[in-house]
């Protein structure tokens, strides 16, 4: 293990504990915390959105303007999460909005300008605050311009001469594609010719800029790193990732067990441990409470849970065609999520027809997310693609066996029962077809009906898996120093 103490700036568009829309926020809290626990000095940089409750009471560390953006002042607020200083970049023009990225399913038209400003301000504030990181760790397209600006604008700046950049790719489907004019406030883009970022004569990709310019690139699972080298897996960026293959790493995300452990979970009706008596009793109480909460009959049947964004990426289009056929059997399903209104309407209609077996909650509730993990016997993640995934790891911790499509981090973290009975932690299928999903669902249900003891054994084995962030953090440090 590396002994050198590093100073790290972790830049992300959202951080759990302050504001969250997806899994990136979980990583942006848990990984910095684990890096700090390893003895490294870390700051987090994020936009100080007006929706962050603590923002307006936080200390102002800096009030400044950008040299190339003189009419848009910004402030840096001192926020905190898990004892780590969060440098919140406040700018009313860009971050005082009702939401982070979009309203009414419509992305803000100036998102390119907003996050170009954020990246520029991140670098501008560092010498002014006398923070000199060894590593700047960017995440996804929102901060993809950080490595680019570091390499271009600050190439001859002595303050940044020893700074290395890393870009984590959490989901390459979101490339941050914008017209040159949308980010023309950055002087580097006024020429309308930036080969490192260009995707056409008129548009650039912030993600591509980061991939081209970062010193190291990290995919959030080993399998996803391999998938990024293909046209399908990279969503059209294969040549960019192939050109950087020697600098491309794949590190599986960890689980924040301080939040996702049935032994200490304050959300669930009854806590339980990874032994048979405790698990059976705890999950029984939790299942009954969930059934009452969502209006399902109090029955001891196989419970299937799902918590996700309602998008095709999450495999809803594999589930919908076979859902009613599967509901003919003795079981219950609870799905919680928001997203595509068409998918939500279809789920609502099926739930109305099968109200004794299927409940759909069109909302995101952290409490319900925890309840579903604790109550379910099986957890559905039939994703079309899944760079890492976290819910399958949470599920194992609670003894809810994940049913996954073997892609990305799902392939790296779930051992299929039919492939390895002894070490199994769930069930998986490969072909992206509704019929394939139905087959694996029936495999799980048949095992539940015929050998409940075996299901309990697998659940206990799954609960004993360890996907700690401390292990992942050590791999990140090795990458930083590589």
UniProtKB/Swiss-Prot annotation:
It catalyses: [(1->4)-alpha-D-glucosyl](n) + ADP-alpha-D-glucose = [(1->4)-alpha-D-glucosyl](n+1) + ADP + H(+). ADP-alpha-D-glucose binds at residue 20. Belongs to the glycosyltransferase 1 family. Bacterial/plant glycogen synthase subfamily. The keyword Zinc does not apply. This is Glycogen synthase. Keywords: Glycogen biosynthesis, Glycosyltransferase, Transferase. GO terms for cellular component: cytosol. Gene3D superfamilies: Glycogen Phosphorylase B. Its EC number is 2.4.1.21. CDD domains: GT5_Glycogen_synthase_DULL1-like. It is an enzyme of class 2 (transferase). Signal peptide: none annotated. The keyword Glycosyltransferase applies. It holds the Pfam family Glycos_transf_1. It comes from Aliivibrio salmonicida (strain LFI1238) (Vibrio salmonicida (strain LFI1238)). GO terms for biological process: glycogen biosynthetic process. HAMAP family: Glycogen_synth.
């Amino acid at each position: 293990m590396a002994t050198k103490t590093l100073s790290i700036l972790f830049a992300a568009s959202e951080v759990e504990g302050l504001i969250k829309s997806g899994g990136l926020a979980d990583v942006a809290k848990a990984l910095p915390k684990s890096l700090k626990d390893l003895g490294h000095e870390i700051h987090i940089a994020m936009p100080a959105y007006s929706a962050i409750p603590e923002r307006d009471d936080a200390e102002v560390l800096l009030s400044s303007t950008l040299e190339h953006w003189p009419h848009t002042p910004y402030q840096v607020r001192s926020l905190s999460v898990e004892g780590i200083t969060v440098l919140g970049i406040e700018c009313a023009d860009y971050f005082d909005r009702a939401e982070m990225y979009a309203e009414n399913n419509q992305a803000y038209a100036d998102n390119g300008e907003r996050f170009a400003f954020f990246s520029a301000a991140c670098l501008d504030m560092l010498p002014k605050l006398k923070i000199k990181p060894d590593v700047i760790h960017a995440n996804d397209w929102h901060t993809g311009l950080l490595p680019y600006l570091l390499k271009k604008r600050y190439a001859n700046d002595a303050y940044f001469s020893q700074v290395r950049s890393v870009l984590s790719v959490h989901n390459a489907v979101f490339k941050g594609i914008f017209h040159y004019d949308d980010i023309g406030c950055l002087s580097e883009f006024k020429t309308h010719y930036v080969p490192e970022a260009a995707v056409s004569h008129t548009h650039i990709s912030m993600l591509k800029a980061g991939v081209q310019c970062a010193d190291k690139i990290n995919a959030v699972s080993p399998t996803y790193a391999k998938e990024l080298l293909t046209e399908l897996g990279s969503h059209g960026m294969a040549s960019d990732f192939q050109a950087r293959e020697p600098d491309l790493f794949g590190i599986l995300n960890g689980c924040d067990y301080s939040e996702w452990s049935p032994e200490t979970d304050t959300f669930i009706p009854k806590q339980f441990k990874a032994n048979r008596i405790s698990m059976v009793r705890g999950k029984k109480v939790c299942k009954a409470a969930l059934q009452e909460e969502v209006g399902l009959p109090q029955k001891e049947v196989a419970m299937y849970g799902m918590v996700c964004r309602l998008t095709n990426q999450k495999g809803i289009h594999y589930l919908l065609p076979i859902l009613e056929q599967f509901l003919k059997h003795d079981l219950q399903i609870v799905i919680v999520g928001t997203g595509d209104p068409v998918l939500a309407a279809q789920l609502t209609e099926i739930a109305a027809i099968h109200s004794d077996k299927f409940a759909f909650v069109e909302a995101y509730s952290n409490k319900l997310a925890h309840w579903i993990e604790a109550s379910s016997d099986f957890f559905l993640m039939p994703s079309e693609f899944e760079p890492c995934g976290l819910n399958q790891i949470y599920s194992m911790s609670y003894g809810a066996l994940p049913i996954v499509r073997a892609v990305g981090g799902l392939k790296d973290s779930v051992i299929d029962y039919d492939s390895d009975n002894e070490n199994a932690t769930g069930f998986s299928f490969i072909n992206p077809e509704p019929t394939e999903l139905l087959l694996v669902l029936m495999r799980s249900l048949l095992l539940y009906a015929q050998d409940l003891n075996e299901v309990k054994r697998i659940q206990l084995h799954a609960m004993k898996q360890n996907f700690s962030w401390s292990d992942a953090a050590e791999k990140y440090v090795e990458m930083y120093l590589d």
